């Protein structure tokens, strides 16, 4: 498995597809994703030879160059692939239902993976709070985040509503 960052966010995307397909004989499985952050993510397979000379396919992930986008797409695409390759089940981040601690504005065109802190509420249920500004370049939004909220396309989602959260770290008690 190969993962690179930054190729998709500069002038190089024009070169990525022809290089993988024509020069390396690979296949691009997706080149843009309708999600936020991480839209310019690419996944491809490239034929190579294993150590014993047998033909195998190498997985290639091209992740966005913005730090928050790179970390989110690493967790959503690369980690599950590594888990699968190593036989770890279930693959990927664990998903749990959480209640929103406050209203969140939604993207009207793309699903969003919103950086958040999940903790145990007074009633014993899991509650999520945003880490703040969610721009792709906002590394600070990752500092305290222990989860990614899976938010639908829409206008807004209200305080107390339930969403799924992908856990990236430990949950703190009250």
Question: Where are the language model's segments positioned?
Answer:
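Glycine/threonine-rich flexible loop motifs
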Residues: 11-18
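Flexible glycine/proline-rich
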Residues: 19-174
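Single conserved hydrophobic/aromatic residue that forms the stacking wall/gate
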Residues: 1-10
